[in-house]
Every structure is written in C-alpha cells, then in structure tokens.
Regions:
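Multi-pass alpha-helical transmembrane bundles in non-GPCR membrane proteins
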Residues: 1-218
Length: 218
C-alpha cells in the first residue's frame, strides 16, 4: 500500500530547509577536515573523514530533495526509500572517524565496531528497498541501536579520547536519541521538523568531536 502524504506544504518546506543546513555544514567542515588530513598525510584520518562526509552528505542531500518534491511527484515515493537508507549511512559514516582514527589501535574494538556499523548500514539499505511500513518502530529502534553500539567500546573510547571529545559525542547521542523520539511522533504536526533540527544539532556536536579527534591524533 502506498504511503499517505500527511505533511503539509509548509511542513515540507521546513523539513527541506532544515536539512539543507546540513549540506552546508558538510561541505564547509568537510573541506576543512580533508585539507587538514591531507597536510598531515594521514591516510587513516582521510579515509575516516571521507566515509563520514559521504554518509552525512548522502543523508542530508536525499532528505533535502525528498522533502522539497511535490507530494504528487512520481519521484517522491522512490526517493523516500533512499531517504531511509541514507540514515543508516549517516550513522555508519559518523562512526568512521572514531573507529579508524581513535579506536584503530585499541585492539579489536575499532575494526570490530567499524565492520558492525557498516554491515548494519548495508543490511539497513537492503531493507529500505523492501515494502516499507510508515515510520516503523523497528526501524527507529535499529537507528537507536546502531547509535548506542559505541557503548560496547566505552572503556577503550575513554582511554583513546580526551574528555572534551567524549562530552561532544555524548551530547550528540542525546540529540539523536531525543530526535528519534520526535520521529516516532511523525503524525503530529511539525514533529518531523523538530526531528530534523535535533539531527542537525547532533551533526554539529559530531563535527566538534571530530575536530577534537583530529587535533589529538594529527
């Protein structure tokens, strides 16, 4: 059964505009991070940052375009699947600078977590192109579970990072989990827009955390 469009035109404008801000953040700070890594000639840092940027920009671009499309557009439903899949990439991409830079030399923790989140992203992408039920609670729980999986490596993470970076990663988690709660209330007016702003706040927290990681390891 096709998804019923319940966002008003004004809501969709806010949904699109809010995540266009994420594109700007990704381009600006992505350029800064890549130039930084290039100057330091760090292949692992460069790889981590590239995966992070791919995931974040993929998510924000698909979301911005999806919500900007008319409710009557034949592309809206098709792009919706990519919009859902991109969230998995955003989460996995966010883990990449942490696992490939900070946790890479912490035994199996770095690579184990890296493989786990990207495997989840691949499986999540596949599931996104199957028959979707609107705002599935299982999907929301999967997003939260991926986000919280870092807790299994809490001790190595504490050992590997300075307190400031840890605080920003914790703040990021709070933003995303709070946003997920609003996402589950999507059928209430403007709740999806609120979710978008919490995601944007989480991205800002993560950018600051990545900045701290690069300062510490480069």
């Amino acid at each position: 059964m096709r998804r019923k469009i319940f966002f008003s035109h004004k809501e969709e404008l806010w949904n699109s505009w809010s995540h266009s801000g994420g594109i700007v953040l990704g381009v600006v700070f992505g350029t800064i991070f890549l130039v930084w890594c290039s100057k330091e000639r760090s292949g692992w840092a460069t790889a981590g940052v590239i995966l992070y940027l791919v995931g974040m920009l993929f998510s924000y671009i698909t979301s911005t375009v999806y919500h900007a499309l008319s409710a009557h557009s034949v592309w809206k439903e098709r792009l919706r699947k990519w919009d859902h899949a991109a969230i998995y990439w955003h989460i996995a991409g966010s883990y990449s600078p942490i696992t490939l830079i900070a946790l890479r030399n912490q035994g199996a923790w770095g690579w184990g977590l890296f493989v786990f989140v990207w495997l989840c992203a691949i499986l999540g992408t596949i599931s996104s192109f199957r028959k979707l039920r609107d705002h599935s609670n299982l999907e929301t729980l999967t997003f939260i579970g991926m986000g919280l999986s870092v807790l299994v490596a809490f001790k190595p993470l504490v050992d590997a990072l300075e307190t400031q970076s840890l605080v920003w990663i914790f703040a990021e988690g709070v933003m995303y989990i709070t946003g997920a709660l609003f996402y589950s209330l999507n059928k209430r007016k403007y709740m999806h827009t609120v979710f978008h702003f919490f995601v944007l706040a989480g991205s800002i927290c993560h950018i600051i955390a990545v900045w701290g990681i690069l300062m510490e390891y480069l």
